[in-house]
Amino acid sequence: MASQGTKRSYEQMETGGDRQNATEIRASVGRMVSGIGRFYIQMCTELKLSDYEGRLIQNSITIERMVLSAFDERRNKYLEEHPSAGKDPKKTGGPIYRRRDGKWMRELILYDKEEIRRIWRQANNGEDATAGLTHLMIWHSNLNDATYQRTRALVRTGMDPRMCSLMQGSTLPRRSGAAGAAVKGVGTMVMELIRMIKRGINDRNFWRGENGRRTRIAYERMCNILKGKFQTAAQRAMMDQVRESRNPGNAEIEDLIFLARSALILRGSVAHKSCLPACVYGLAVASGYDFEREGYSLVGIDPFRLLQNSQVFSLIRPNENPAHKSQLVWMACHSAAFEDLRVSSFIRGTRVVPRGQLSTRGVQIASNENMETMDSSTLELRSRYWAIRTRSGGNTNQQRASAGQISVQPTFSVQRNLPFERATIMAAFTGNTEGRTSDMRTEIIRMMESARSEDVSFQGRGVFELSDEKATNPIVPSFDMSNEGSYFFGDNAEEYDN
């Protein structure tokens, strides 16, 4: 993968930079997060938030959403052209929670988008700092991935709800650029493409005229992004077929669903980045930490170290378990919603439980929830070890894909086997190997059948002590081979509704 020479690292995508050396990358990522931090501090001043209120993750999310909305040009233009009752297209806002007489109060605030844009630019040396905005989008996306299930979205596009581990980044907005594309799972890309093809089937003008030409370019670009995620020649060849199709229809949808299923074993490369809430960067900047001088990386020790020293609070509903709320946010911070629970538990140093066993709902609080009974507690976001985030699917020895699990997309580069039920997955591949992609389908099925769940992925890779910032002594954990590691097992989470 890395030998292609044209690949930019995530940090380059993240900061919109061209090829840079490691020091420059660390500096530009540092510049990006310190801009987020400075913006957050300024917003806390504007809103007169106390130190405690500024550390409340719900307030952080509201402030993040405000700046994302202020810069959402396409939506802003749409809102101005289609005025809806009670929505001022020039304003943005949300709930801010304040502590009053021992109780939490909700206050709805409203700001001019222009004013928010001014504060953001001022915090980012007068620039638009799109990279910082994308970073916030990815943090929200990672939080959604850990919190909600996408069963309905999967079923609607004709995919199997058990393919949830392929859905990383499914709630990312389209404007999230290259950094956003890098973190999208195979299932997310397939779903976007299927939606597009279905529109083309239902609307004859979709591919026609000047607009249709732009649509076609977008379609081919999405196909290429997905192709780049696959690691075997047969999967890539099938993507070429889908991309080159004269007018994409049901045959292409079939091929895409086939490819998505195959990705449960022949996993795609999906990037993982630790994107933290704005308040965490704000706290660090306020305490005098110079991100740009020190440098920062989203895939190394830095986010772990930052979380070791940050105290973040969260509102807790009456029957929620604060430890479970902490787990949810920890997973979101490290983009670990689709990681093997054995690996996450080892790194975190406390047991990470499947979502079906969590007594907690999402982090955000609906406007109709009763604030009288709300409490708050400290989120435990520290870890026992740290590990390097991966951008590969953990397939063993390059071109040959290894065992995958019906619900794992590795986040950490740590040696483990990837347990999976081959029977369950292979059952989805009965029959249909005819048509123009038959030889590729046969080849893909052959590779999947030869995969063994005893195979070890990320051979020799381990976790590191938090004192080992240069990653010199890997500690290779040994896992119980038989143990199931799926977060979505026995799931009862809410659906994601936009």
Curated annotation (Swiss-Prot):
Encapsidates the negative strand viral RNA, protecting it from nucleases. The encapsidated genomic RNA is termed the ribonucleoprotein (RNP) and serves as template for transcription and replication. The RNP needs to be localized in the host nucleus to start an infectious cycle, but is too large to diffuse through the nuclear pore complex. NP comprises at least 2 nuclear localization signals that are responsible for the active RNP import into the nucleus through cellular importin alpha/beta pathway. Late in virus-infected cells, may be cleaved from a 56-kDa protein to a 53-kDa protein by a cellular caspase. This cleavage might be a marker for the onset of apoptosis in infected cells or have a specific function in virus host interaction. One of its GO terms (biological process) is viral penetration into host nucleus. The gene is NP. Its main location: virion. A motif (Bipartite nuclear localization signal) lies at residues 198-216. Keywords: Capsid protein, Helical capsid protein, Host nucleus, Host-virus interaction, Ribonucleoprotein, RNA-binding, Viral nucleoprotein, Viral penetration into host nucleus, Virion, Virus entry into host cell. The keyword DNA-binding does not apply. This is Nucleoprotein. It is found in: Virion; Host nucleus. Belongs to the influenza viruses nucleoprotein family. It comes from Influenza A virus (strain A/Duck/Ukraine/2/1960 H11N8). Residues 1-21 are annotated as: Disordered. InterPro entries: Flu_NP. GO terms for molecular function: RNA binding; structural molecule activity. It comes from the Viruses. Homomultimerizes to form the nucleocapsid. May bind host exportin-1/XPO1. Binds to viral genomic RNA. Protein-RNA contacts are mediated by a combination of electrostatic interactions between positively charged residues and the phosphate backbone and planar interactions between aromatic side chains and bases. A motif (Unconventional nuclear localization signal) lies at residues 1-18. Pfam families: Flu_NP. One of its GO terms (cellular component) is host cell.
